[in-house]
A protein has these predicted regions:
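C-terminal output helix
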Residues: 80-89, 93, 101
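Basic/polar phosphate-binding segments, predominantly the helix-turn-helix DNA-binding elements
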Residues: 142-167
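Acidic, metal-coordinating helix/loop segments flanking the phosphotransfer/catalytic sites
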Residues: 4-22
Length: 167
């Protein structure tokens, strides 16, 4: 399934409400540009794990640095070949799957090994600490955990699934 948005604000809303595996965004968009969208996403614990590719017609070092510094996993200048974009998408998705596979094979590996960003690392440490502290609590529920993490149960599910491949 492919989701489309006419601007960065709509895209951010779509990403927060749907399960998304990858973002491909143009830099030049109305209301919220691609740099802002990427920065917002990479600083939002609910969606920071989603790989992000920025596309641009700007051919200068400052623009490229701005894109990568906003958190983009890849930055491609237009015009680009569809083969190159396909390879980039494949590599990002494959590395995410390898990370998930590694965790599935070694479920007791340090949770920090799942983090793809500092935001994810903080999230995973907080989640792990809470679970270790409350594991003996018979009343522990997904709702309590989501509340502690400051997100809805569906956002918590998407985040954990996105980072670990587990539900």
């Amino acid at each position: 399934q492919v989701l489309e948005a006419e601007n960065g604000k709509v895209a951010l809303d779509l990403v927060r409400k749907n399960t998304v595996n990858l973002i491909i965004s143009d830099v030049m968009m109305p209301i919220m540009d691609g740099f802002e969208l990427c920065n917002e996403m990479k600083n939002d614990v609910n969606v920071s794990h989603i790989p992000f590719i920025l596309l641009t017609a700007q051919h200068n070092l400052q623009s490229r640095l701005k894109g990568l510094n906003s958190g983009a996993d890849a930055y491609m200048e237009k015009p680009f070949s569809i083969e190159l974009l396909t390879a980039q998408v494949g590599n990002l998705l494959k590395s995410r799957k390898l990370l998930n596979k590694t965790y599935l094979e070694k479920p007791f590996a340090p949770v920090a090994s799942l983090a793809v960003s500092q935001v994810d690392d903080i999230f995973l440490r907080k989640l792990n600490d809470y679970l270790e502290e409350h594991l003996s609590n018979e009343a522990l529920s997904v709702e309590m955990l989501a509340d502690t993490m400051g997100m809805s149960t569906s956002s918590l599910y998407r985040k954990v699934k996105g980072l670990s491949g587990l539900s």
